[in-house]
Amino acid sequence: MAAPILDPNAPAFTRRYMNLADPRLGAKALFASDEFFAPKERMLDPEPAVFIPGKYDDHGKWMDGWETRRKRTTGHDFCVVRLARPGVVYGVDLDTSHFTGNFPPAASIDACVSDADTPPDDAVWETLVPATTLAGNQHHYVDVSNPRAYTHLRVNLYPDGGLARLRVYGQPQRDWSRAARGELVDLAAIENGAYLVAANNEHFGPASRMLMPGRGANMGDGWETRRRREPGNDWAIVALARPGVIRRVEVDTAHFKGNFPDRCSLQAARVAGGTDASLVTQAMFWPMLLGEQPLGMDSVHTFETQLAALGPVTHVRLNIHPDGGVSRLRFWGELA
């Protein structure tokens, strides 16, 4: 589940929420009006776009993204994408990296809700991102303010051209009424709706990666901080998918061997109201869910009997002492 190092100038939604258009989680490019120069699937590749000088194929210069032919008629090109999970979109990244003389002058995104794999012809599409001016070889971050959960997107290029990557950052929606009473659910799973509130340092990898499914693919697939040269410790705050009583915790240091944290601890609380900034301040004083525990390299560390009985909580702060990398974090709990 490796993910690119994030643009340090990218907005907060890129670090907080999951990419609903990630094919590793089930997203799929279903149909494109044209993909002559480069297939639609490349647009969803989770890795950063690359440029390979001198690489050509039967259709011309090989480009890492979705690229249509030059349109000689009226109209515009489009691509329909099924999201990995139905979700509320908070922001998108329309990335034209390496497309310089062949990027679309503008793009927009429509959205719909459909139970079908491919939306029917009579699907009702709504504007999610209005027509937005694009430039070549750069990220275009667009905030979205729409509380509705969608299943499919339609990316429109005006009139044609290439889009290196599409990232759709949002919070998946799950039907919690189907969860059995007493069932243990991963309350830290990003696919269940958990998200990263804040982290004090993400030099080598975003803390939100800890919430991704599966085990890390490599050392680059996790949260890793820079080497701490001053007193203190590093930390990350997670908003749980739902309020719950945490029964089991897993801290996975997969692939972190010379750079795993020496110890970890957890603080937790049930929080109502406030802002992310206020949570960061409050979290310093939350009660301990788990006292300091030693960690080892490249291992899953499970804690059950060591957990304090705090009752239902909504947020957890992971402290790593003094610094290092954590691949995955699981909070198995019962819904409150």
From Swiss-Prot:
Keywords: Hydrolase, Purine metabolism. Pfam families: Allantoicase. Its EC number is 3.5.3.4. InterPro entries: Allantoicase, Allantoicase_dom, Galactose-bd-like_sf. GO terms for biological process: allantoin catabolic process; purine nucleobase metabolic process. The keyword Lyase does not apply. The keyword Hydrolase applies. GO terms for molecular function: allantoicase activity. Pathway: Nitrogen metabolism; (S)-allantoin degradation; (S)-ureidoglycolate from allantoate (aminidohydrolase route): step 1/1. It comes from the Bacteria. It catalyses: allantoate + H2O = (S)-ureidoglycolate + urea. Belongs to the allantoicase family. This is Probable allantoicase 2. The gene is alc2.
